[in-house]
Amino acid sequence: MRLGWFNYYLKDIGAEPVSLVQMQRNDGAWHLEETWPPKDAEWLEMGLDQFQAIGSRVSTTSSITLESEVFENETHISGLPTLHLAVQALCKGGQIFATMKDATTGLRLGHGVMDLRYRDGGYDAKVTVPFLSYTMKMEFNPMDVVIPAGHSIAIELTETGEDYLPSPDCAVIGMNVETTSSSVLSLPLIDRAEEDVRWFKVIEPADPANASS
């Protein structure tokens, strides 16, 4: 594949190689896809009323923890999950940092962050009025992860996280979040059987330290 790319694009030799995506899942497994996110992904929508929720406000001193029911089957999330949150502003802005984890093992799976003023996406801030309700259309960073059968997922909603700065004016006050069916987590799922030809193994380079003299 790499030689074909080199010959066609750099030496103008041969036919144009097929463009494929090589994606590594969080457990180390590799799979080939024509596009990524995969075109055949099916969306699983979960209202937050289906989660066990602790907390109702996100600020510098309060957070919300959500835990799903157990997944009966192994579940492969491949793409950009979305989290649409119904919130009540308590200030003229504010932000939410959402972290997704495997609730059974504590393994971090991904995150997303959004400023309430950019609740519909894009680059233009919108006016936010205290005590009015809005929908934050959050999107997680790209994820290709597996949830083993019998595990559940957790969503932690905090005011900030990683290397993000707190909201400059509204962090202490925060905002209220409806953990009801009005707030929805959507997961892009794909099904790849163990014998699917799109799975492949990467040959690891030999360790020079173990090479015979």
Please annotate each region the language model reported.
Residues N7-S213:
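Glycine/threonine-rich phosphate-binding loop and adjacent beta-strand/alpha-helix elements that clamp
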Residues M1-W5:
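Extracytoplasmic/secreted proteins, especially bacterial periplasmic and envelope-associated proteins
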